[in-house]
Amino acid sequence: MSSETVAQHYNAVRQEGVAGRAESRIFYLRNLNNWMKSELINEALHMLRDEAVNKMFRPRVLDLACGKGGDLRKWKIANVDSIVMADVADVSLSQAKERYDEMAQRERYGLFRAEFVHADCCKDNLKSLMKSHPEFDLVSCQFALHYSFIDEQSARTFLRNATETLRPGGFLIGTLPDAERIVWAVRENDGEFKNAVCSVRYDNKDEMERPPLFGAKFHFTLDSQVNCPEFLAYFPLVKHLLEELDMELVFMRRFPEALRHWKTTGAGLLSRMQGLEPYPPRNGAKLSAEDNEYEQAKEFVKTLDSSENPSIGTLSKSEWEAFCMYLVFAFRKKGGSQAAAPSSAKSKLDEESPVESKRRRTEEHGEAATS
């Protein structure tokens, strides 16, 4: 599979309106994923501003594999100075520019500057294609890095593009399918994991027990929204390749861990973004899934004071299982201020024994997100 295949797939994905998104079976999962990205961006901005001399600091951002520009509003809220948006899918990139232009027209005091670059970041030198040549403070790559792991050269080229123009002390952040979790899920289900909203099938059953570091193809479908071959990006390998590029790990958190980490400070935004489904449903609303998808939420509500008509935020079991298949990460380029230097703690992938790792995966498989 080539980058052209990925571009053709995402170019063909229909742009959905607000009404269509609200009716989606994965409405809450989508919102929760968006909230996760918002919190990740917020944490990176806090680290950048903590070390900045000028507390009115406005970062220069590279949005790598920006798609249709779904994070443009997040960058507006983040008060960025400028942004370069790059993607291999030309139709998606055009839609991102249209979205930016519409936002700019509505802004009374102007919007951040933006450049849109059509590039195959697995092959091209992105820096040479930019009209502007900024040193970026922040590079963001959301749900896309793993496509480059089709082979070693593509992965190395993509990561070089992600880090080459990042200033010392700047951050690379992103979201990524959790290769360890995916391999566990397909092994436990004879090569294919499937529930009401997603399916994951590993391409070559014969190599499931020992997938290759590059070119480990799997097929992921989420509510019929994504059905393009993807590739496992084993996080310790990602970390190793980035360390060769003078990057150091700040944190890696699997989505359930990240949700727990941000849930308290980000509770208001989580509620406004409707990232969790109210249970029991309010005002005669219907649940987004069958009642048996909320067994853990039902049992948890029973432990609360019934006189107060308690309600919690949760996800259906199927959405939660899909949510658990991702992780977030942040790397920092060496040099610059040490104010945001990473902790010396190892990631769970580095420190867990096989027994501990298996127990954690089993616990997450049955866990429900509640607040």
Residue ranges and their predicted role:
Residues 187, 193-196, 205-371:
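C-terminal lobe and adjacent flexible extensions of AdoMet/dcAdoMet transferase-like proteins
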Residues 168-177:
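Conserved beta-strand signature within the Rossmann-like core of class I S-adenosyl-L-methionine
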Residues 154-168:
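A short glycine-rich, Lys/Arg-flanked "PGG" loop and its adjoining helix->strand segment in the class I
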Residues 136-154:
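A short SAM/SAH-binding and catalytic strip from SAM-dependent methyltransferases
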Residues 2-55:
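Class I SAM-dependent methyltransferase Rossmann-like catalytic core
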